[in-house]
Amino acid sequence: MLFIISDDLTYTTLSCYGNTVCHTPNIDRLAETGTLFTKAYCQGTYCGPSRASFMTGYYPHAINAMGYKNPRPEIGNRATWSQHFKNNGYYTARVSKIFHMGVPGGIEEGGHGADDEASWTERFNSPGPEWKAPGTGETLEGNPDGIVPVKGGNTFVVVEADGDDMVHSDGKTAAKAAELIRQPRDKPFFIGVGFVRPHVPFVAPREYYEDFLP
């Protein structure tokens, strides 16, 4: 089983849901051959509670997961989604952000964040430069004249970064996931792959901006 999640991606930005500006060909191909949900709702309005909810199967308020923390102290020895597979003979791996992980801070540090160790056979993090990536950028908040330089933190900044995908967290995540899928093994797998974009900061290789520049 391959589970893929992106961070802060609203359905209204996807071509398969009618967006005519954004280009999402890979997601569109999945939609063409799978199920396209029109009434699926998030149980938590922000990152930590939402992820804790779908990984444990509980409402956020039922396990006191209202912040950015690991739900394990509240669920005790009850199995998470991936842990259920692990307990039944599956190889389970996490690549980057599945449970909560700070963006951009946690990605810059390359740590495990609020991950649940018991849920996985192996865990792989994908550190990246985030807003510090070399390139051209500016801060979008409170900057009507476009003169405020890029600054750190959980802020709306945009960086047209030098280099290719492998400079950044998501490029590393995709490469590691592909490597794990191709590895021969004697048991089935559950691989959770977490991409951190389009969560702020808006950092991507320069080539992805070209179609949208004036």
Region locations from a protein language model:
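Formylglycine-dependent sulfatase
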Residues: M1-P214
